[in-house]
Amino acid sequence: VSIRDLIKSAMRMRPDRIIVGEVRGVESVDMIQAMSSGHDGSISTGHSGSPEEMLSRLETMVLMGTDIPLMAIRKQIASAIDIIVQLERLRDKSRRVTEITEVVGYEDGEIRLNPLFIFKEVAEDKVENVVREEGCYEKIEDEVSGRLIYSGNRLIHRKKLEAAALQLEGGL
């Protein structure tokens, strides 16, 4: 049984959302269609170096499974995906969220993005003794220190959150 078959079977069950562990190929066509057909809150993962690269990979995977023109694929991706959460494995082998980006829409032949949060590393000389929940009071050697910084960009598509009765805090 392929992932494509599983996504199609899940669609027949009329779920509220669909979660696919990872898209690697033509099953991305079905995942995008599921996300575009009223399954808000659906989630999937993929591997790339940045949100822009993920969109490019997704376009390529969809092209492998269909004969749809690139413009139509980009429009469908832009309407299906709301947020991209980028994780990276850092030099200390930890995995961190390094970017949270809103997919704004399709304009001038491209999918437009709105970066909301970006991981900023703290310089080594600015990190002294770090308090950890476990009780360690000194910095672990070679550990990457940093945090997600709000970009200052406001979330553009707020109506979906409001429709779900969710409130945003602060200036986002």
Region roles according to the model:
Residues 1-9:
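Nucleotide-state-sensitive switch-loop elements of NTP-binding domains
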Residues 2, 69-70, 167:
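General structural signal for secondary-structure boundaries
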Residues 6, 18, 116-118:
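Intrinsic disorder/low-structure terminal segments
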Residues 10-108:
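Conserved P-loop NTPase nucleotide-binding/switch module
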Residues 93, 99-172:
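NTP-binding/hydrolysis catalytic cores, primarily Walker-type P-loop NTPases
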